Amino acid sequence: MDSNKVIVMDNGTGFVKCGFAGANFPTAIFPSMVGRPILRSEEKVENVEIKDIMVGDEAAKLRSMLQITYPLENGIIRNWDDITHVWDYALKEKLKVSDPTECKILLTEPPMNPVANRQKMIECMFEKYGFQAVYVAIQAVLTLYAQGLLTGVVVDSGDGVTHIIPVYEGYSIPHLTRRLDVAGRDVTRYLIKLLLLRGYAFNRTADFETIRQIKEKLCYVAYDVQQEMKLASETTVLVENYTLPDGRVIKVGQERFQASEALFNPSLVDVEGGGVHEQLFDCITKADRDLQQGFYQHIVLSGGSSMYPGLPSRLEKEIRSLYLERVLKGNKEGLAKFKCRIEDPPRRKHMVFLGGAVLADLTKDRDDFWITKAEYMEKGFGALDKLTKLSV
């Protein structure tokens, strides 16, 4: 089958990444949002026609005039009407798919996705769009494929949720999977709060996009927070100027590392539970002893919120210190034997899509892999049993 008849769709809380099998990069990346006009007074704004339903880039452009909704929350589809608008936009506007009945589609899902959700995704693909065949893959497993691995722990931090997922021989391990409800969106909100405390005036919704851009350009993870605080209070080396769209110039200093600290200390954004390092350590130490070494040596970062400079080294430092304290009980000599490696692939922002594109390309002609329309018509949701076995 022709690769451009095999679609790969990675639905994230913040962004949809979509394209074709075998691609090195998504064809389109757009915000996972739907907007409806608050007032129907004008037909066009900035050359964009105002429609009853606006999706993706178009909705983002006119967000101040729209009632915005996000179909996914914490990685899981919550609004089915809206997600079909998002899929319509992706297939028709972005990928220019004229006839889905000639195509196959690989969708991604978060770990611990409710079974009813998976069923509804498949039902929609066959009954609304009429695809020939469908496959649903767990995002973390795709990340490892993109990295050329079958076993490892994926720390996947996107816009709406951070997951820590151990994968062994291509199978994710649900009972060891950890979910942390702190991700990109929370760091952006926290950065707004920190800048408001500094006396800068922002509108929390309209300026959200601007602050997200500041975060992506200037924020980093401190290796040693105390050291950075000392630097920030005694010098101006950390201060960077940023010009806002309205021409104002703001100075961003210690907020550059304070915002991302929410990943390590969720209480900063009023979320209970341990930080990403504690959840990662907990996930590995609760695994079978034989698997732990392989997990420590293959910790793979994935998702847009793993892009902060300094994150890999800080995470490694925190894991080593937890290992020293809780496993070695303070015996520093044992630390020399402890091997921990954090892999931070340069293209990790789109790792899930890349893994999906590799998998879809390898399997595009294998009927034993995909759920076909005929199987779905015959067995209904029973056809989903195929997905529990993943052999590549």
UniProtKB/Swiss-Prot annotation:
Primary site of residence: cytoplasm
GO biological process terms, semicolon-separated: actin filament polymerization; aggregation involved in sorocarp development; Arp2/3 complex-mediated actin nucleation; bleb assembly; chemotaxis to cAMP; exocytosis; hyperosmotic response; phagocytosis
Molecular function terms, GO-annotated: actin filament binding; ATP binding
Taxonomy of the source species: Eukaryota, Amoebozoa, Evosea, Eumycetozoa, Dictyostelia
Entry similarity comment: Belongs to the actin family. ARP2 subfamily.
Record's subcellular location: Cytoplasm, Cytoskeleton; Cytoplasm, Cytosol; Cytoplasm, Cell cortex; Cell projection, Pseudopodium
Protein name: Actin-related protein 2
Subunit composition and interactions: Component of the Arp2/3 complex composed of arpB/Arp2, arpC/Arp3, arcA/p41-arc, arcB/p34-arc, arcC/p21-arc, arcD/p20-arc and arcE/p16-arc. Interacts with carmil (via the region between the LRR domain and COOH-terminal proline-rich domain); carmil is required for Arp2/3-dependent actin nucleation. Arp2/3 complex, MyoB, MyoC, and the alpha and beta subunits of capping protein all form a larger complex with carmil.
Binding site for ATP: 158-160, 212-216, 303-308
